[in-house]
Amino acid sequence: MFALNKCLVKSCGNIAVSTFDASGNIADKENYCLDHTPDPGKAQQEIYNYIKNHDKIVGLNTAGMTFMNIDLTNKRFYGCNFMHCTFTNLH
């Protein structure tokens, strides 16, 4: 299941988006929510790449992201958080 790490901004109550270690695996560490991430474009691209490179996705937190023109064919998601996400033109 995804980690319920809160955003590093103390006044923010949002859940932090997933981060990745040097090997490209989901890391269970503190981070920012999408609104406070210093580089939201980079965070979104890392999540897109993770989805692209894995068929079985476990524990991914993407709260608040917009997914556009992404191919989810044969992808399986387990214990992931897509709260407040927007999905457009998925395949």
What does each model-found stretch correspond to?
Residues 2-27, 43-91:
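Tandem repeat scaffolds
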Residues 24-37:
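Cysteine-rich micro-motifs
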